[in-house]
Structure formats: C-alpha cells, structure tokens
Curated annotation (Swiss-Prot):
Pfam family, one: Ank
Biological processes per GO annotation: innate immune response
Keywords in alphabetical order: ANK repeat, Repeat
Highest taxon of source: Viruses
Protein name in the entry: Putative ankyrin repeat protein L36
UniProt ANK repeat ranges: 1-14, 15-44, 45-74, 76-104, 105-134, 136-161, 163-191
InterPro entries according to UniProt: Ankyrin-KH/SAM_domain (IPR051631), Ankyrin_rpt (IPR002110), Ankyrin_rpt-contain_sf (IPR036770)
Amino acid sequence: MVKYLVAQGVNVDAQNSRALCLACKYGYINIAYFLMHEGANIYANDNHPIRLAAEYGHLSIVKLLIYHNANIRAVEDSALRMAAKRNKLEVVKYIIEKIGTNYEYSDYPLAYAAGKGHIEMIEYLLSIGEKITDYAMFMAINNGHVGTVKYLIDESQSLPCISYSELAKITRKGHLEMIKLLNNRGIKINKIVNTTIINETIEKERWEILEYFNKIGVNNNC
C-alpha cells in the first residue's frame, strides 16, 4: 500500500515526514527503508525519526538511520533519555557505544529510569559512571517505586532530603509503603507532616496513611 501511494504521487515528506516517523516509532524497518530511499527527510523535526526509533526500542532502525547520518544526539541527547525511560537497554547500550558517556544532562537518563522503576537500566547506567542524585531519588519516590528507592538508598548510602512538598505529593498519591520505607530508613516523617498535609490526607480519603501518621506520633506536632 505504501509503495502504491508513493507511486500515485503522495508526498513522502508530508507533515514533517510523518510517515517515516510512524514507521520508526512502530518498528516497520522495511517501510522506513523504502521511504528513505524515496527521499523522506530523516532530519525532519530535529531528527524526530531516530529519536522515536530509540525511544520505542527499535535498534535496527536506529542503526539504519545512523548509517544514513541521522543525528542520534539531536535535542540534547533526548534519544538516550527516552530510551532509558522506556527501559530499552540494548538501544541505550548502543547509543553509549556511539557517543560515549559525555552526554547532555548526564543525570537525566538514570533519573528517567528511576521514575519508571527500571532497576536493570539503573544498574547499567551506574556501571558507566552515572551518579545517583536527589532528582533520581525523587522521581522514584514520587512514582511509588519502593524497590527502586530501596536500591538507590542502598547504592548511594544516603537518604534524600524530603521536604514538605515532596511528602505532600506522595501522600496525595497514596504511597503508604513509600512513606513507611522513608520513615524506617531514618527520615523523620513525623517532623515533616503539618496541618496542611493532614487536611489533604483527609480530603483525599487516604485513611491508611492517616492511621500511620497517628501511629508515628504526627498528631503531637499538628
């Protein structure tokens, strides 16, 4: 069908090479190759085709586009960050092989992976020299990834600095096990909770969290 439409004069570059972008996003390498051969712009919209291929884990298409000189580092290395976020480990390894470890926003790939709970990805990124930052911790904490936060705390041998606003976020989301973990690891939750958090907990009907707050003596401070 694609070949037929092109033969009928359809513009392969229409809408910023949208056809090529979709082929790259969904992994249709034969269609991607055909569109490129027909003149589709691989650099459209800041190299969007290769960024989509990387984000969705289509390594063969990433390699094909790099062979044709697409810029894997476009938009401040966003392909690497998005591949890490979506847990596309083989793509991340390949990009690192190509560009090395001196990439833009060097703590973001690990933070993005932490925000999705991808421990294997985090392990790899640590192995190539990325550091665990508070940003990575907060991404995992805010999204309720208890196992990931345990891993990050153990690896870094440090605790994140939990503010009122951070605690308020995880309370609103109902992440009771996260609150317990942080408290058990030494963060004094009962010293952070204030009347506003208590009121929000009640408003959101987070009764188990409210009971836990009572258990650790929060009411004495509000």
